[in-house]
């Protein structure tokens, strides 16, 4: 009998499944590389007219968002499982997680520390926002503020590139699912 799209093979992690502890380790490592000081320097360059207190507050909000990413991902996986949508959601989250785990990306955390995770967090949040655009909201979370906040910090050029990465991932997953469904219909 052919495997259904949302069934996992025994003993195998589903496609795109990344250990969230790896993402938490990346966050911890980035915090160790310059911590808040490096993040505040980055923000000061992006927001040159901001007062010191505003820069510090922006850094604190940034860290809160970054620290929330593993929770967002875990909750999205859980929701996908509960709704039988793992064949769609897991590969999309896998793309976002792989970007998060790349040390050298558009804003490399290997060089920038915590500031290098701003683009990663933006990409995850934009992925979740796109999942909410279906016929029924996926998580129904209001992620507009964090997305806009991070877009301000990463800049429009990088944000556009990240948005394109999300759209490309969605198109890839759609093509893969169409191919799978075609094969399944031929097997039936």
Q: Can you name each region flagged by the protein language model?
A:
Residues 1-91, 129-188:
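Terminal, membrane-proximal amphipathic helices
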């Amino acid at each position: 009998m052919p495997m259904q799209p949302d069934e996992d093979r025994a003993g195998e992690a589903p496609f795109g499944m990344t250990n969230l502890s790896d993402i938490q380790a990346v966050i911890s490592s980035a915090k160790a590389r310059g911590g808040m000081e490096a993040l505040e320097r980055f923000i000061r360059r992006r927001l040159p007219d901001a007062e010191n207190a505003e820069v510090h507050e922006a850094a604190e909000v940034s860290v809160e968002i970054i620290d929330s990413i593993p929770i967002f991902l875990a909750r999205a996986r859980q929701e996908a499982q509960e709704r039988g949508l793992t064949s769609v959601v897991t590969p999309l989250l896998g793309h976002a997680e792989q970007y998060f785990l790349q040390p050298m990306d558009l804003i490399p955390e290997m060089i920038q520390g915590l500031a290098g995770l701003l683009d990663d967090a933006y990409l995850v949040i934009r992925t979740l926002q796109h999942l909410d655009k279906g016929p029924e909201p996926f998580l129904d979370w209001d992620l507009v503020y964090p997305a806009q906040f991070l877009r301000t910090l990463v800049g429009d050029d990088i944000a556009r590139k990240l948005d394109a990465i999300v759209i490309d991932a969605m198109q890839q997953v759609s093509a893969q699912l169409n191919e799978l469904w075609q094969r399944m219909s031929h097997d039936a």
